[in-house]
């Protein structure tokens, strides 16, 4: 019974993180997030992803191996974005705030 409750919570958390990730990506790219939250589909990015998938299917096995290597690099970018969505970037920002605070104290002492 407790497993079901945890399951529901994790689904909500995952959804929230996805939405937050989209907001972060849109802010970094300078685009507004659509009201329905389907940023990729409205901006045509979803269609571009589908075209890449079709090219991979049509390509030979040799091309797939090369693309898999490229995919690993892209996965690294996604991991960085996911980390920022989970608060790692927020923690780094907090560290910056601490530095600013120290500078202010130094300025006041002078």
From Swiss-Prot:
List of residues that carry N6-succinyllysine: 15
Cellular component aspect of the GO annotation: nucleus
Taxonomic placement: Eukaryota, Metazoa, Chordata, Craniata, Vertebrata
Species of origin: Pongo abelii
Annotated segments matching region Disordered: 1-110
Cross-linked sites for Glycyl lysine isopeptide (Lys-Gly) (interchain with G-Cter in SUMO2): 102
Name of the protein described by the UniProt record: Prothymosin alpha
Subunit structure: Interacts with NUPR1; regulates apoptotic process.
N-acetylmethionine PTM sites in chain numbering: 1
């Amino acid at each position: 019974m407790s497993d079901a409750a945890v399951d529901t919570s994790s689904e909500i958390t995952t959804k929230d993180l996805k939405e937050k990730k989209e907001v972060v990506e849109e802010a970094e790219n300078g685009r507004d997030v659509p009201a329905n939250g389907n940023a990729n589909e409205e901006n045509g990015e979803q269609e571009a992803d589908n075209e890449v998938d079709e090219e991979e299917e049509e390509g030979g096995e040799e091309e797939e191996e090369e693309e898999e290597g490229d995919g690993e690099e892209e996965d690294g970018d996604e991991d960085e974005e996911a980390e920022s969505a989970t608060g790692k970037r927020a923690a780094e920002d907090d560290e910056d705030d601490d530095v600013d605070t120290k500078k202010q104290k130094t300025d006041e002492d002078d």
